[in-house]
């Protein structure tokens, strides 16, 4: 048996460190980054995914919520707590990151969190913002109105021209100025 007292001080210290490391590995110390990588779960030091799996779709991108209730979680998995519950099918959100089957989304207020991929769909939607707007029959400021639309109304984005977009809100279809709603990037073309 090795007598640690007979070793010089630096070697004694290294021997103690090696023994401590071996003991911790036997006690089930938390997995290292290398162990997590081997299991396909790489996380940064902040606990967020460091190497998310990519679908090949552009990031960020707009999508809509698929269900009437969608749990927004603090991380990509059911083990993470629910931070917020959206209760608005068709609400437009941005996907800003992806990890496995989870999508990090951002809403119109800048709130971010994780939802399962099954809770979003590729259909483009809008959320009317600001004040009351006239939904127009044509993409012109003086065109006849189809309906008056209040802030908070959710609809479907059909297509866009330079300054106007055609949208469907319930049973009404018409044109709104691009700056009247959330759900579209500046200069983005939608056909």
Please provide the spans of the model-predicted regions.
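Sec/Tat signal peptide C-region and signal peptidase I cleavage site
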Residues: 29-34
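N-terminal secretory signal peptides that target proteins for export/translocation
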Residues: 1-11
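Alpha-helical transmembrane segments
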Residues: 10, 14-17, 86
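Generic N-terminal simple sequence motifs
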Residues: 6, 26-27, 56
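Bacterial N-terminal signal peptides
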Residues: 14-26
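SH3-family beta-barrel domains
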Residues: 35-74, 85-89, 96-99, 103-111, ...
